[in-house]
């Protein structure tokens, strides 16, 4: 066994896998999943374990384009979302969650994903640090979001304009009525983008996800994930 001083003198060897190289996507995740790859649109995209409800690939494609249209046209003036804006999703897993995330991706809007166990103070840091404009919240977490807005000095009226209840089968409508908010259903069924926002060439380096660390040893750290990195993941 050579000692460490001789390692640098040893010839280098490159080992090449026998598995062919993958052709990596050079587009957005939305385009890769719904335009480039070929899958039966009737197949399930997501299944809700607790209820057995299914969201098919066709459903998800249709609803995400409707969502992308809705955030441009149905949100209050001054809070509508366009390419390059940032929105927050504050919700545990549900069938509404993929509609929101893929809807934001289709519209070219950056998504920052908040831990559904956050307190209002923890949520306030991520909301302000990410520069999110609108929060899509699970019905049960609406009080946390409203408390967060109060903490950072946003008026009750403006808070209601920046908050959308994210629910598709549960008590979203009831919560929306109680607090005077829009809900997911208000954004759907009014039209759809004719196509998703495209990310090609240098545009594939644009940020589409802002994920945050747990903040165990200090404030959570934001991590930017660009369009092309998202599209790489399903390739593997």
PLM regions with names:
Residues 1-86, 102, 107, 170-176:
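N-lobe entry segment of adenylate-forming
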Residues 97-105, 111, 230:
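Short hydrophobic alpha-helical segments of the AMP-binding
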Residues 87, 104, 135, 207, ...:
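Conserved S/T- and glycine-rich ATP-binding loop of Class I adenylate-forming
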């Amino acid at each position: 066994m050579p000692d460490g001083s001789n390692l640098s003198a040893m010839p280098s060897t490159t080992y090449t896998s026998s598995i062919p190289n993958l052709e990596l996507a050079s587009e957005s995740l939305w385009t890769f999943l719904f335009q480039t790859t070929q899958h039966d649109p009737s197949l399930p995209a997501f299944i809700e374990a607790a209820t057995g409800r299914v969201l098919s690939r066709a459903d998800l494609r249709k609803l995400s384009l409707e969502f992308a249209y809705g955030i441009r046209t149905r949100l209050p003036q001054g809070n509508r979302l366009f390419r390059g804006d940032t929105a927050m999703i504050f919700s545990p897993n549900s069938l509404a969650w993929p509609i929101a995330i893929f809807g934001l991706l289709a519209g070219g809007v950056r998504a920052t994903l908040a831990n559904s166990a956050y307190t209002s103070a923890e949520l306030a840091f991520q909301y302000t640090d990410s520069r999110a404009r609108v929060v899509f919240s699970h019905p049960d977490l609406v009080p946390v979001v409203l408390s967060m807005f109060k903490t950072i000095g946003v008026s009750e009226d403006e808070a209601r304009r920046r908050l959308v209840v994210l629910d598709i089968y549960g008590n979203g409508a009831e919560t929306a009525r109680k607090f005077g908010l829009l809900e997911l259903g208000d954004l759907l069924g009014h039209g759809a983008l004719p196509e998703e926002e495209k990310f090609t060439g240098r545009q594939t380096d644009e940020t589409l996800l802002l994920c945050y660390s747990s903040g165990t040893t200090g404030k959570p750290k934001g991590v930017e994930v660009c369009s092309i990195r998202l599209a790489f993941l399903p390739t593997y």
